[in-house]
């Protein structure tokens, strides 16, 4: 499976090529995305204010969401069982002293 992914201003670049017009997506900010992407971006109704979004084979995230972005990519690529990926994510997001050590 091929995926297309963009985080931070790379998600805005996806808007400039029209890749976000038909899918649910996010970016740093809707106004910022519209300014960067210009007239090629017509997907405003599909924008949601969320750390990371996966719709079909396209993954987008804002610049403060590298963990969420990585999690969505790993799930999309099916590199491990989703439960294992979520364990990894929770361990790194919540920290060594809060989350249990993931069992890979």
What are these model-derived regions, one by one?
Residues 1-5, 9-104:
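Active-site-adjacent pocket-lining segments in enzyme domains
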